[in-house]
Amino acid sequence: MRPKTFPATTYSGNSRQRLQEIREGLKQPSKSSVQGLPAGPNSDTSLDAKVLGSKDATRQQQQMRATPKFGPYQKALREIRYSLLPFANESGTSAAAEVNRQMLQELVNAGCDQEMAGRALKQTGSRSIEAALEYISKMGYLDPRNEQIVRVIKQTSPGKGLMPTPVTRRPSFEGTGDSFASYHQLSGTPYEGPSFGADGPTALEEMPRPYVDYLFPGVGPHGPGHQHQHPPKGYGASVEAAGAHFPLQGAHYGRPHLLVPGEPLGYGVQRSPSFQSKTPPETGGYASLPTKGQGGPPGAGLAFPPPAAGLYVPHPHHKQAGPAAHQLHVLGSRSQVFASDSPPQSLLTPSRNSLNVDLYELGSTSVQQWPAATLARRDSLQKPGLEAPPRAHVAFRPDCPVPSRTNSFNSHQPRPGPPGKAEPSLPAPNTVTAVTAAHILHPVKSVRVLRPEPQTAVGPSHPAWVPAPAPAPAPAPAPAAEGLDAKEEHALALGGAGAFPLDVEYGGPDRRCPPPPYPKHLLLRSKSEQYDLDSLCAGMEQSLRAGPNEPEGGDKSRKSAKGDKGGKDKKQIQTSPVPVRKNSRDEEKRESRIKSYSPYAFKFFMEQHVENVIKTYQQKVNRRLQLEQEMAKAGLCEAEQEQMRKILYQKESNYNRLKRAKMDKSMFVKIKTLGIGAFGEVCLACKVDTHALYAMKTLRKKDVLNRNQVAHVKAERDILAEADNEWVVKLYYSFQDKDSLYFVMDYIPGGDMMSLLIRMEVFPEHLARFYIAELTLAIESVHKMGFIHRDIKPDNILIDLDGHIKLTDFGLCTGFRWTHNSKYYQKGSHVRQDSMEPSDLWDDVSNCRCGDRLKTLEQRARKQHQRCLAHSLVGTPNYIAPEVLLRKGYTQLCDWWSVGVILFEMLVGQPPFLAPTPTETQLKVINWENTLHIPAQVKLSPEARDLITKLCCSADHRLGRNGADDLKAHPFFSAIDFSSDIRKQPAPYVPTISHPMDTSNFDPVDEESPWNDASEGSTKAWDTLTSPNNKHPEHAFYEFTFRRFFDDNGYPFRCPKPSGAEASQAESSDLESSDLVDQTEGCQPVYV
């Protein structure tokens, strides 16, 4: 593929068509009119001027407007015919005989091809070298190997204005902004006579630029094996030194590369693989730049001659408003071609696309200073329409490597030189076309990135209160060595090459201060005392150099700044903001750090997690099976069944998403406290988003850990999560935070059985029969799930809106699972005592607060004291089976013992083993054979008396050994139909509820004292528990979080019944809605 270059003309055809057109025009010179043409040997000059002038006009017109396909070349051909008319009738033999051998030798020595030079002299009649050169330039298209050189010549045609005009000797063009003019009229004076040759080296300085290019042509494109023989030179070394040789290499056309001593072969700049040549760099890949006065013969063939004193100046981008687009000019020193003239401003404009680096001036010339636009801001000037100030160049270091230009077309092939010949320093054209690399999209590759070298950053602009200094005149030029020592060294990272310093002077109005914060002695004290920029920078540099050991002067200035109190109120230097971290963020970061847990904790967690995952999957399968069974019973059609399945799938998806949402107590608002227990409290709470009502039970972690209740809490969570029946309070959410555990459950507004016993004292036998029958079914459902409640008592039996019961508070429940065993939550060989076991705290009645209330009757006072013990921090052993207290091993029969004790209390009015202290109560329970007596004055039916004695007995003879059917078959329940759903039957007692948030059925609770006292008492135990020697188990509350699949927004009960006359009217509708709710409880997955 040909490289993308800039066409030298607007001609739309290809080069072959253009050559064919020129050949046809040259073969028919007689078609053009020849009248009025001057004859004579001196007519060539005028014709040439006319031709050149017309070419200039043609190129300018081509730039202004579009021309036909062959329009400009018709005019050019006509003018060529004018110049060839005097020789149209000459024969080739006669012309060949008249060839001037001296001119032929001079042209050959100048680098022209011998055949081309002979043909040119034949056609021009050996009149002058000027005419021969003109012919060679016109016939360059006929040589295909010089096609790209001709392309360069055409690009520098007069219409483009790319060639410099011959300049007069003046000191410098710097800052003038002049652009090179077009070609001037060619005069043959420099080529005639003895001034051309070794005796007249200055002729090249006054020679027009294009003809210097023609006299010193570069070698065209060659293959790897092609050898180009250079003709011998006929001029002296001084003329040779006047030009620089740029061999045009590569597969397309040549790219000059400058090499100086010390530069390694290959590319000195690290480039990405997409721009690197896959062929090895050739040894002679860079041209030699001979210097003036170089010793030795020209043909010495030095591989690395001393660098030329020249400037390698890139031109602006072709889109910029500049006359020279992508041209690279080699400007010699004062003794060489154009040496006396500095390049104009347009030449010194840097180019971004050519990716060139600047060479540096050599010789005895003075070091120029950097302009105001520094390197850091150089790219900001590379925009179309912007005139960049001239870039002065830094003194060149001969011992430092110079990076070459980066280009994707630098694929150099090794080209051996002529055998037996030393490589001469051949001149080359002064203009070279810069190739713009095409944008190639490469796949992303992992490229090793070199570590960047630290460089000095440019500080921010000085504060507004510091007056900008007036632009000072440029300082006197200093030698390169002094500049290197006086200025800061900037290390430029070059691949494999050592870093070399650059002399950079940040002068002019754009000088910048060091970055803030500034030292205290530089702070502004008052408006009258203004620091100029130089003093600020000097003071900052001094403070930075001083480091921790500051000089005495700095201490004095600091003391004076501190002592000046008036200056504190003045405006200070704005320093960089210092980030301030909040304590809360620090805590979050500390909490978010990954903690290291023991392998035992990991094992504990994984075993529970795997069990819960399997359980969750099984529940999902059961829900699908339940849906299919319900749809089969309902006889739904296939479309309806598919719709119900989609509804279930959507619910499953929502459930999985909601399970991942983190919950905290801020999602609930506490309304009122319902009760206080041993480890926490139960309160009525409202969910913020749905305004649903829940009963939220809060347990303090420190009390749970201190009382060794972790296993019990886990058991309660498991039973509430797995229980999905009407006899157990439904758990909706369970979550935890740093201090507490939370259970969010159904709110049962009817209160508990203990409150009803305190109010009614003694139940009628039919009411007791109803509650005991429902309690039997509730315990049976717990046993069927594989759990043992172990704490059945009136406080844990709740009465719902319709008067039916529900079990709650499974804190002492166990399912004979390993997670419900306390030993898995303890460390060491010391085992803590279970809370159900006898304790010295049972004799502590300091927590009893019944004495604070007025005692109207002795019996009522005893009842209230009993309630106080039930809600105390240690509980009461009144309802616990003796085998549990004796630690002899127990089964689910211990729950049936509790049923007999509750039946006794309902019918008699007090527990059978009531005692002043828990210890005495425990002793009575253990010696139940001697202490259990049914009062004679209490009139009980024989069935009730028999049931009590068969339940409160030894475990071997207790009812319930064969399950709940033993109790259902007892004569005491002859009036109860267990075959039908007892919850659908109307209850003998229905609590009075006025509104959904009515808590009148619960005992009033002092919301502060018991809780605060408990927290104060347990703080010491918590401190002891969390000490380094007795650290609490880290795996205590794994897998505690829970979310129920079907959330009915906290309204498991119907709307409260109206009071008074409206009750009878709404009773039938209430019963129907009750039946609907009860029917859907078993198949809730079906309904959304």
From Swiss-Prot:
ATP binds at L674, G675, I676, G677, A678, F679, G680, E681, V682, K697. The keyword Transport does not apply. It is found in: Cytoplasm, Cytoskeleton, Microtubule organizing center, Centrosome; Cytoplasm; Cytoplasm, Cytoskeleton, Spindle pole; Nucleus. It catalyses: L-seryl-[protein] + ATP = O-phospho-L-seryl-[protein] + ADP + H(+); L-threonyl-[protein] + ATP = O-phospho-L-threonyl-[protein] + ADP + H(+). Residues 974-1052 form the AGC-kinase C-terminal domain. Autophosphorylated and phosphorylated during M-phase and the G1/S-phase of the cell cycle. Phosphorylated and activated by STK3/MST2. Phosphorylated by MAP4Ks; in parallel to STK3/MST2 and resulting to its activation. Phosphorylation by NUAK2 may regulate its activity in phosphorylation and inactivation YAP1. Belongs to the protein kinase superfamily. AGC Ser/Thr protein kinase family. This is Serine/threonine-protein kinase LATS2. The lineage of its organism: Eukaryota, Metazoa, Chordata, Craniata, Vertebrata.
